[in-house]
Amino acid sequence: MKKIAIDAMGGDFAPQALVEGANQALQEFSDIELILYGDEAKIKQYLTASERVSIVHTDEKINSDDEPTKAIRQKKNSSMVLAAKAVKAGEADAVLSAGNTGALLAAGFFIVGRIKNIDRPGLLSTLPTVEGQGFDMLDLGANAENTAHHLYQYAKLGSFYAESVRGIKRPRVGLLNNGTESSKGDPLRKETYELLAADSSLNFIGNVEARELMNGVADVVVTDGFTGNAVLKSIEGTALSIMGQLKKSILGGGLKAKLGALLLKDSLKELKSRLDYSDAGGAVLFGLKAPVVKTHGSSDAKTVCSTIRQIRTMLHTDVVGKSVTEFSKEETQ
């Protein structure tokens, strides 16, 4: 039975969204146990499940505007810190939070800990593509600066994730760059290209451009954290803008527009589903000794349940264990 520690007090709609998502997950899966950390009285208002779930009460929580490292050190009884400590102590197998991203990264680094020989854990998320499969990208902002070796490690981690969690055999790995030619890019990109091309265990397809990402050009895309975070926000904004403009045009376009929308109802619903990647779960701080997953601060119960499903898959496929085994080989090389 796998145990998942949940910071029930993090996020815009805590604890309701976290607890209702937990209820859904417990109905869907019979092989997980959930530990909810937070205000017991508030959690019980929404908790309908009675089996395979427990509550660890705490009055303390980390707020969205708290300074991350300071919050982890000073709020030692907060729901997020206690959830991370449970993993470190072996009382839980993974952590889920919708709270302060920086604080969760700090909790992952300083409490859960890095896998040996991983230089810098990266933030990985599955982002949407027009055909619906999506692609995994990292780093999405865990690190402001990266070296070529960091990006090389991200390619290996991303490949493990795509293959183990998403079931993609020999995932195609692309390096985000300003052109597809091998000679393109700054020194970081050029050095990374050489490292990736030299590793035959990776299905490296070369450089990929940002304009091709949502067309499914690669299954795994690696980049530095600064660039990755900018791309993430650009994709989020583009998806929201497209759906918002469609809705505005339909509502303000008169009878013909409304009739057209009615005829295209199923197609529009499919488009919305493809652009909405919440079903893929949350962002994984990959490279740690256990899954630490951040779901969006505005997540609803459905998204929380999807993130629990994602964590369950990570645990059952032992993607972290595979990473530990792979990176332990570096000591013998």
Swiss-Prot record:
It is found in: Cytoplasm. GO terms for biological process: fatty acid biosynthetic process; phospholipid biosynthetic process. Pathway: Lipid metabolism; phospholipid metabolism. Its EC number is 2.3.1.274. It catalyses: a fatty acyl-[ACP] + phosphate = an acyl phosphate + holo-[ACP]. GO terms for molecular function: phosphate:acyl-[acyl carrier protein] acyltransferase activity. One of its GO terms (cellular component) is cytoplasm. Keywords: Cytoplasm, Lipid biosynthesis, Lipid metabolism, Phospholipid biosynthesis, Phospholipid metabolism, Transferase. It is an enzyme of class 2 (transferase). Pfam families: FA_synthesis. It comes from the Bacteria. Signal peptide: none annotated. The keyword Cytoplasm applies. Homodimer. Probably interacts with PlsY. Belongs to the PlsX family. Catalyzes the reversible formation of acyl-phosphate (acyl-PO(4)) from acyl-[acyl-carrier-protein] (acyl-ACP). This enzyme utilizes acyl-ACP as fatty acyl donor, but not acyl-CoA. This is Phosphate acyltransferase. It comes from Streptococcus gordonii (strain Challis / ATCC 35105 / BCRC 15272 / CH1 / DL1 / V288). The lineage of its organism: Bacteria, Bacillati, Bacillota, Bacilli, Lactobacillales.
